[in-house]
Curated annotation (Swiss-Prot):
Record-level GO cellular component terms: cytoplasm
GO molecular function: phosphatidylinositol transfer activity
Annotated GO biological process: intermembrane phospholipid transfer; phospholipid transport
Pfam family, one: CRAL_TRIO_N
Entry superkingdom: Eukaryota
Protein name: CRAL-TRIO domain-containing protein C3H8.02
Keyword Phosphoprotein: yes
Residues modified as Phosphoserine: S40, S81
């Protein structure tokens, strides 16, 4: 897929329809039926087939959602010019696995988990990551996304990780890894993507608990989301293999990281640079390569020296320890006194969550108009983009009440975006015309 394709600002008509379909399913899982939007019945235009593997197409239409069924049954009806279909063949779409995951929550609880997962992202942008990762197969993308919601809330408890971070006194291993700089984020690559460095030599098997390594991995990935500057959506990882030996090789954490990128943070990896790998790493790489998706393998680059690194990172962003001119060195600033006070302010947190949720509900309402083609579509899309920007603002207003300040806050690398440049895609005769819309943020 070309760079920038399949993003909120650059969708084909078919891709937009698949995004609408995914939203439609999510609404049903949230207990929101499209029929609540009006007293009439509507048919939603969609195309569910995975073009890369099947030529058959399917049609999705609105009906009430029955929890007792073992599938989402979607049947057609008509309402004037709103009735549309791609072909004459309709088919029920089996989503038993998705419904099984969703059954762990009541509909409103699932909706809350969804918006927590959106975090500071554009909601469309987040869903599109999963659609691209599953080659626009809506059913597969929805299952992947629901597994991620389960993983975030029931397995890893991501909210608790970011809420405590290096203030988590009981997890000394977590803080120890931050202090030594086992991994850190610094600078950008040539595509303006943030770069995360992992110093393999600083990891010793058994030195810290596997759980703390997993927590650190998730924390870094969540932190990178906050550092990304739209429209940049991916980050680059540099594995610094300087002085690497087999005592540093730990397959468990590596498998966990791969799982995170491939299953829960799809389309987040820009490039993976393996720097100064010794000859003994060849055997290790042959094993690791067999675990990776071919798309991920294509993103892995090997460098030996400063000259090689310059292919991917501009010289002014290459640190002295890699032969570059930049003198910056990682040091760990300890937590500041009283910097976690906002986390104790329950009333402020409740109030700001309520404000964010009110905007989310407005976004859902306008999204239903978009799905059903209600009103002037240019105006509806504009409203959605503005509300998406307001959701980002609302997240940043809430941020200090739900996320512990981190080393990157103390360094000044994490700060609310003061404005968001949004791209609205308008397909015309198969071509995408991009228009820039700047929305000023009110986040403080």
């Amino acid at each position: 897929m070309p760079e920038g394709a399949g993003r909120p600002w650059n969708l084909t008509e078919l891709e937009e329809e698949k995004l609408k379909t995914m939203w439609s399913y999510l609404f049903k899982l949230f207990g929101i039926t499209l029929l609540e939007r009006t007293e009439s019945w509507y048919t939603v235009k969609t195309h569910l087939s995975d073009d890369s593997s099947s030529s058959s197409s399917h049609r999705l239409s609105s009906v009430s959602y029955a929890k007792s069924r073992t599938r989402l049954e979607l049947t057609s009806s008509s309402h004037g010019s709103d009735t549309r279909s791609f072909n004459d063949k309709t088919k029920n779409v089996h989503l038993e696995r998705v419904e099984k995951i969703a059954s762990e929550w009541d509909p409103e609880g699932l909706r809350v988990c969804f918006w927590d997962a959106v975090n500071c992202d554009d909601p469309d942008g987040l869903l599109l990551r999963f659609l691209r990762a599953r080659k626009w197969n809506v059913e597969a993308a929805l299952e992947m996304f629901m597994k991620t919601v389960h993983w975030r809330s029931r397995e890893m408890n991501v909210g608790e990780i970011v809420c405590n971070a290096d203030h988590l006194d009981k997890d000394d291993d977590f803080v120890r890894q931050l202090r030594i700089g086992k991994c850190f984020i610094f600078g950008e690559d040539k595509h303006n993507r943030p770069v995360c460095y992992i110093r393999a030599r600083l990891h010793k098997v058994g030195d810290v608990s596997p759980e703390s390594v997993e927590r650190l991995t998730v924390w870094v990935m969540e932190t990178a989301r906050l550092i990304l500057k739209p429209p940049i959506e991916t980050a680059t990882v540099v594995f610094d293999m300087t002085d690497f030996s087999m005592s540093n090789m730990d397959y468990g954490p590596l498998k966990f990281m791969i799982k995170c990128f491939e299953a829960h943070y799809p389309e987040c990896l820009g490039e993976c640079i393996v720097h100064k790998a010794p000859w003994l790493f060849q055997g290790v790489w042959s094993i690791i390569k067999s675990w990776l998706d071919p798309v991920v393998v294509s993103k892995v680059k090997f460098t030996r020296n400063y000259r090689d690194l310059q292919q991917y990172i501009n010289p002014d962003n290459i640190l002295k320890e890699f032969g570059g001119p930049n003198p910056w060195r990682y040091t760990y600033p300890e937590p500041c006194q009283n910097e976690a006070e906002a986390l104790k302010n329950v009333e402020a947190r409740k109030s700001l969550r309520a404000k964010k949720d009110a905007i989310a509900k407005q976004y859902e309402e306008v999204t239903m108009d978009w799905i059903l083609n209600n009103g002037d579509m240019a105006e509806v899309k504009q409203k959605r983009r503005k509300l998406a920007s307001q959701l980002i603002d609302a997240y940043w207003n809430l941020d200090k009440y739900i996320r512990a300040r981190s080393v990157y806050d103390r360094m000044g690398l994490i700060a609310p975006q003061t404005s968001h440049t949004l791209l609205l895609s308008q397909p015309t005769n198969g071509d995408v015309k991009e228009s820039m819309v700047e929305v000023t943020s009110s986040a403080t």
